[in-house]
């Protein structure tokens, strides 16, 4: 149940999105105890992103805990303007995601949980496909794993002892 919600003015200019809320249950001697799990993504729109997954008895508490966790787990992503530097594939669990850069004006061509991650990180032009499971938790994990694996040409050239012009041909 991918419920998407934007909360403006959250912290230091961060964008927060609620990706999914699930009802979970714990079976005890007296019956079932119900709780909620919230999955959120947080980004600054300029190459930083994090996700949070938390449980609580009430939905608002689960969302709040998840947002706090997402803010603590933020990572830097190397972007090429409003798109990616190169195609990348990543996996988490049974979710495999493939992302590739797109030209200006293409937009975000991605589904569900991947779209929320791209919107908060600041990517506006990307082609993406999720293969395998569409479980939002694993899709978000795989997407962030792929984005953090991106390398800009400057750092790759420095690591290889070349100039950027030599690297790009």
Curated annotation (Swiss-Prot):
Q: Which GO terms describe its cellular component?
A: small ribosomal subunit
Free-text function comment from the UniProt entry: With S4 and S12 plays an important role in translational accuracy. Located at the back of the 30S subunit body where it stabilizes the conformation of the head with respect to the body.
Keyword set, alphabetical order: Ribonucleoprotein, Ribosomal protein, RNA-binding, rRNA-binding
**What is the protein name for this chain?**
Small ribosomal subunit protein uS5
Subunit and partners:
Part of the 30S ribosomal subunit. Contacts proteins S4 and S8.
UniProt superkingdom: Bacteria
**Occurrences of domain S5 DRBM (ranges):** 14-77
Q: State the PANTHER family in the record.
A: MITOCHONDRIAL RIBOSOMAL PROTEIN S5
Question: Can you name one GO molecular function term for this protein?
Answer: structural constituent of ribosome
Protein family per UniProt: Belongs to the universal ribosomal protein uS5 family.
- InterPro entries, per the entry: Ribosomal_Su5_D2-typ_SF, Ribosomal_uS5, Ribosomal_uS5_bac-type, Ribosomal_uS5_C, Ribosomal_uS5_N, Ribosomal_uS5_N_CS, Ribsml_uS5_D2-typ_fold_subgr
> GO biological process annotations for this chain's record?
translation
């Amino acid at each position: 149940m991918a419920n998407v919600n934007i909360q403006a003015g959250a912290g230091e200019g961060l964008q927060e999105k609620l990706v999914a809320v699930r009802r979970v249950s714990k079976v005890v001697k007296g019956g079932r105890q119900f709780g909620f799990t919230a999955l959120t993504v947080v980004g600054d729109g300029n190459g930083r992103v994090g996700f949070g997954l938390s449980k609580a008895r009430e939905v608002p508490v689960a969302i709040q805990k998840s947002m706090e966790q997402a803010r603590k787990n933020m990572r830097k992503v190397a972007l090429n303007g409003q798109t990616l530097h190169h195609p990348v594939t990543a996996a988490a669990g049974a979710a495999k995601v493939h992302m590739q850069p797109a030209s200006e004006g293409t937009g975000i061509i991605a589904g569900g949980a991947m779209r929320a991650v791209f919107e908060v990180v600041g990517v506006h032009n990307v082609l993406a496909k999720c293969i395998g499971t569409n479980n939002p938790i694993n899709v978000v994990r795989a997407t962030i794993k792929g984005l953090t694996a991106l390398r800009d040409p400057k750092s790759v050239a420095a690591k290889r002892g070349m100039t950027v012009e030599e690297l790009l041909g």
